[in-house]
């Protein structure tokens, strides 16, 4: 399992948008390298959260939580370059499970062991997150599943470093 990045990991507060974007893209390249290594050793790699992580900047802008789409645009350029260099790739399969708001609130109320910082913000990201992965699935059907699979899925997927796929996916997204 390739874990999500530590929530306390942050770029320098004085970093520019470009520096901040490069910081996050580098961290995600490290996660991708770990996933590729695990896949080579174990024939499969599972990542907690999409290694591209580009969805976060886009969903923030789409939900109106970041008034500018500048972070998304900056990261988009860097990530496209990472795909070209094969230091980041598109996950072969994405399980995008977005519980309803009522389920999220029930889980929160029933689990006092977690603080769930930014809970309200994350609730607002649910719809844009689904839009993000609907766009991917529309250009590469079957790459996204909407519930946890019972068994590993197989089947031919488009190349994980396919720039045409990436561009078609980005073109399919609603505007921010």
Describe each PLM feature range.
Residues 8, 53, 152:
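Residue-level detector of flexible, active-site-proximal loop/helix-junction positions
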Residues 16, 60-61, 158-161:
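Surface-exposed beta-strand edges and their flanking turn/coil or helix-capping segments
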Residues 109-176:
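NTP-dependent small-molecule kinase module
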Residues 21-30, 68-82, 119-131, 162-167:
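Well-ordered, non-membrane alpha-helical segments in soluble/globular domains
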Residues 36, 47-115:
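ATP-dependent NMP and nucleoside kinases share a basic, alpha-helical "lid"
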Residues 1-44:
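Conserved substrate/cofactor phosphate-moiety recognition/catalytic segment
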Residues 1-4, 44-48, 94-97, 145-147:
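A structural signal for short, well-ordered beta-strand segments and their strand-loop junctions
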Residues 32-39, 83-87, 129-137:
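Hydrophobic, Leu/Ile/Phe/Ala-enriched alpha-helical segments that form helix-helix packing faces
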């Amino acid at each position: 399992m390739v874990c999500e990045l530590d929530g306390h990991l942050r770029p320098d507060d004085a970093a520019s948008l470009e520096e901040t974007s490069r910081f996050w893209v580098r961290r995600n390249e490290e996660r991708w390298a770990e996933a590729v290594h695990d896949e080579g050793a174990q024939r499969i790699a599972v990542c907690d959260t999409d290694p591209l992580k580009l969805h976060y900047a886009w969903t923030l802008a789409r939900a109106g939580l970041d008034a500018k789409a500048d972070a998304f645009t900056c990261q988009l350029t860097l990530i496209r370059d990472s795909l070209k260099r094969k230091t980041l790739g598109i996950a072969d399969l994405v399980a995008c499970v977005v519980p309803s708001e009522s389920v999220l609130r029930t889980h929160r109320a029933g689990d006092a062991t977690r603080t769930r910082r930014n809970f309200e913000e994350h609730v607002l990201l649910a719809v844009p997150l689904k839009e993000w992965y609907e766009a991917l699935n529309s250009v590469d059907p079957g790459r996204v599943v909407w519930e946890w699979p019972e068994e590993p899925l197989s089947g031919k997927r488009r190349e994980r470093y396919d720039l045409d796929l990436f561009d078609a996916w980005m073109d399919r997204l609603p505007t921010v």
